[in-house]
């Protein structure tokens, strides 16, 4: 079973997939004039000025809640466990490739979030967005099958990367703490922890997007800030080793053999591991965060797109980098070639702070994992609704809750292989859609900046789709969507209509 998964994983994350993931990120960066850098200062200003914790109103969640929900799904065990695994398997150089994927992924996530708002629909009292709606309404009904393929893999990914890997990491972290203080791992104890978490997850999923968003906006900032402070404390105490850690990262990217003492010798392995773990931790290219961002009430699609830029920066460039530096600066022995999961991260912190910090790490890991399960629970529910309607949502919520308990007794290696494999499979239709719809992304970006620089202007674009022309509640002259969203006989509801540019690249 494991060998079969390894073969499938290597095929999915082979050279073609890496070229596609990095290539689309580079393509979108060039087409938007490297919007992830031009709009970054504006994104920070907008976030500080306008996006504060609070209610999103009757039809959606607030932009801050959308960002926290997306971060809840990304800033999870990938930051603690995934980074350690990347260093063990791919060497320190894998962090360099994780950075590269992160920088290009900022453009990808910008596109995902902006287009999710552009092509979302309204169902009852909620906005529904994501790659499946981008594909259906942006590319046309003839591509609906590709949206169904994405939703199908999205449901399986919610059980894997958004559930099983998180619970597995929590169990490993808690058992590690118990072992340090004289306890031990027992199957019964694992199952009890799984059942307890399952009950919490089930209660949250029943509350829908609003309850998940409200939980995320309180949990994610607090836990992230605490973890960052722990990391900064370690680096201040080991400040003399920080330059050497950066040297290992850059040297390992081109010559893993030199950086790992001859144990790892493939530069492509460092690239492959860094990219696959990078996608796992920031999910740029997978399109999942677009589901959360598409639920936000914002004035313009590009405005929420900028929150996508911040999301990847906080997750990969900040938190993942801090984790990697802590491991490399702590002085712990790194078991190259053997993925030991979060135990390496725990050893790095305890070697500096002592065993007591393992309790804090286990608590942070539990909170991160719980938030990730909630975020992915929302993604899975949206995918199930797209495929099967309301009954599919209820069935998914039930299965997701049961899977939490079952995942407590699964093996780590099998879970991670399966999760990364499904990640690669669901990224393909999303990346195709992003490239196809890039002209509309460019138009939105230019409309937002008014071609006068990078300073954003106040534009009201609170719009939604229902497979009909764009409805706008603003004084701006906003174009209606392409013909693929307009049914025969429907009237344009915009005050003044200007046809959108063709979505063909």
Labelled PLM ranges:
Residues 110-119, 124, 232-248, 259-262, ...:
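Extracellular/periplasmic helix-exit of transmembrane alpha-helices
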Residues 1-77, 87-94, 105, 405, ...:
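N-terminal alpha-helical transmembrane segments of multi-pass membrane transport
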């Amino acid at each position: 079973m494991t060998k079969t998964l390894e073969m499938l994983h290597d095929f999915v994350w082979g050279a073609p997939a890496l070229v596609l993931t990095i290539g689309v990120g580079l393509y979108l960066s060039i087409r938007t004039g490297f919007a992830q850098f031009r709009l970054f200062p504006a994104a920070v200003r907008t976030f500080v000025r306008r996006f504060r914790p609070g209610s999103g109103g009757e039809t959606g969640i607030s932009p801050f809640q959308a960002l926290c929900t997306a971060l809840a799904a990304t800033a999870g065990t990938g930051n603690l466990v995934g980074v350690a695994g990347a260093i063990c398997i791919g060497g320190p150089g894998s962090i360099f490739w994780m950075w590269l994927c992160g920088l290009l992924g900022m453009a990808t996530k910008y596109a995902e979030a902006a287009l999710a708002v552009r092509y979302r629909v309204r169902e009852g009292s909620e906005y529904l967005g994501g790659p499946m709606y981008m594909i259906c309404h942006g590319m046309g009904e003839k591509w609906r099958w590709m949206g169904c393929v994405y939703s199908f893999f999205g449901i399986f990914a919610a059980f894997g990367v958004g559930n099983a890997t998180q619970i597995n990491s929590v169990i490993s972290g808690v058992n590690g703490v118990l072992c340090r203080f004289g306890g031990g791992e027992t199957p019964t104890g694992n199952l009890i922890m799984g059942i307890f978490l399952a009950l919490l997850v089930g209660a949250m999923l029943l509350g829908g997007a609003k309850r998940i968003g409200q939980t995320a906006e309180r949990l994610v900032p607090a836990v992230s800030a605490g973890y960052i402070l722990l990391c900064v404390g370690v680096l201040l105490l080991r400040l003399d080793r920080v330059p050497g850690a950066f040297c290992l990262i850059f040297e390992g990217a081109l010559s893993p053999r030199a950086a790992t003492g001859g144990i790892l010798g493939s530069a492509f392995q460092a690239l492959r591991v860094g990219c696959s773990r990078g996608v796992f931790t920031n999910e740029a290219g997978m399109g999942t965060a677009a589901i959360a961002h598409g639920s936000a009430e914002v004035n313009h699609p590009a405005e929420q797109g900028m929150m996508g830029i911040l999301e990847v920066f906080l997750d990969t460039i900040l938190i993942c980098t801090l984790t990697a530096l802590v491991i490399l600066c702590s002085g712990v022995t790194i078991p190259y070639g053997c993925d030991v999961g979060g135990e390496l991260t725990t050893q790095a912190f305890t070697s500096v702070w002592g065993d007591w910090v393992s309790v804090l790490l286990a608590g942070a890991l539990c909170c991160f994992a719980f938030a990730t399960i909630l975020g992915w629970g929302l993604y899975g529910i949206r995918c199930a609704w797209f495929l099967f309607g309301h009954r599919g949502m209820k069935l998914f919520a039930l299965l997701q809750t049961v899977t939490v308990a079952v995942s407590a007794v699964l093996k780590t290696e099998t879970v991670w292989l399966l999760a990364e494999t499904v990640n690669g499979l669901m990224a393909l239709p999303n990346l195709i859609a992003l490239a196809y719809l890039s002209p509309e992304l460019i138009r939105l970006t230019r409309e937002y900046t008014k071609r006068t620089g990078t300073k954003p202007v106040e534009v009201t674009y609170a719009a939604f789709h229902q497979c009909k022309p764009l409805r706008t509640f603003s004084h701006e002259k906003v174009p209606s969507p392409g013909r693929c969203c307009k049914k025969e006989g429907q009237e344009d509801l915009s005050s003044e209509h200007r046809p959108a540019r063709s979505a063909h690249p």
